[in-house]
A protein has these predicted regions:
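C-terminal hydrophobic helical "lid"/dimerization subdomain
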Residues: 196-245
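Glycine-rich phosphate-binding loop and adjacent beta-alpha segment
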Residues: 11-13, 145-212, 245
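Short amphipathic alpha-helix with an adjacent loop that forms part of the alpha/beta core around
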Residues: 122-133
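A glycine-/small-residue-rich N-terminal strand-loop-strand element
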Residues: 1-13
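Mid-domain Rossmann-like dinucleotide-binding core that forms the NAD(H)/NADP(H) cofactor-binding site
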Residues: 6, 47-121
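NAD(P)H dinucleotide-binding glycine-rich loop of Rossmann-like/cofactor-binding domains
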Residues: 10-75
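Short, glycine/polar-rich helix-capping loops at beta-to-alpha or helix-loop-helix junctions
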Residues: 22, 100-107, 171-176
Length: 245
């Protein structure tokens, strides 16, 4: 790196598996620091690293998303869900997004969702009303507690990527692989703890090519961390919460 280079850090477990997120300075492995070739300002850039890496990796590295795909984004109002909708819409996909709150429907449509379903835990029949043969791809952000239902939304040869655990259930002891995965369909997953330069470069190229702007809900100063957490835990944020250091 050179002086004045714009760089980002992507640490995966920072703030969860280990401390270090709320500091003015942090010592990081060089493999977790990346050059950011972008015109985004620092507030926008702060919303990119892990969220875009997770969404992009899930869509293009795992689901092999293409322009003619139909995709269900289950957990559409999560930070990763919002970015996934933006990325999928940028290449021309048809998108079904889910939310638990009716007041989020218009927001999801504004960022690119073609259809929005209120998620009560069982949505497969509602998805089949829109796509009788099922969708070609599913991004599962809610988790293992609804994966059986999400599998039922897949078309033949469809792929489901398990990325999120918004439902707080990491593992399922009742998951019957043979019975749950439809014949000719595929289950994969994405884990964000292994960032690499190739994908990060692709992400910034994609952002520039399609003029994608990160959706920012609110910006706080570092002294307002508690307020940022309260907003996050209220589930009322529409987009990323950014903290200025």
């Amino acid at each position: 790196f050179k002086k004045d280079d714009k760089v980002i850090a992507l640490m995966g477990g920072m703030g969860r598996s280990f401390d270090g997120g709320y500091q003015e300075y942090a010592l990081l492995p060089t493999k977790n620091v990346f050059y950011a070739k972008t015109n985004l300002d620092w507030i926008e850039l702060g919303a990119v690293p892990e969220t875009f890496f997770t969404a992009y990796g899930s869509l293009f590295e795992c689901l092999n998303l293409e322009a003619n795909d139909s995709i269900l984004v289950r957990g559409g109002t999560s930070a990763t869900g919002i970015v996934a909708i933006q990325l999928a819409k940028s290449i021309g996909c048809k998108i079904i997004a889910t939310t638990r709150k009716e007041e989020k429907i218009e927001f999801l449509k504004e960022i690119g969702a073609d259809f929005v379903i209120i998620d009560n835990g069982e949505i497969s029949k509602k998805v089949k009303e829109i796509y009788p043969k099922g969708v070609s791809k599913v991004l599962e952000l809610v988790g293992t507690n609804v994966i059986d239902d999400s599998m039922k939304t897949l078309a033949h040869k469809g792929i489901l990527c398990l990325t999120g655990i918004l439902g707080s259930k990491v593992a399922s002891s009742n998951f019957d692989i043979i019975k749950t995965i439809p014949n000719g369909c595929y289950l994969t997953s994405f884990f964000s703890n292994y960032p690499n330069k190739e994908i990060m470069d692709k992400i910034f190229n994609h952002i520039e090519k399609y003029n994608i702007k990160p959706v920012i809900s609110k910006v706080f100063n570092i002294g307002e961390i508690s307020k940022a957490h309260l907003l996050m835990e209220s589930n009322n944020a529409n987009g990323k919460i950014v903290v200025l250091v």
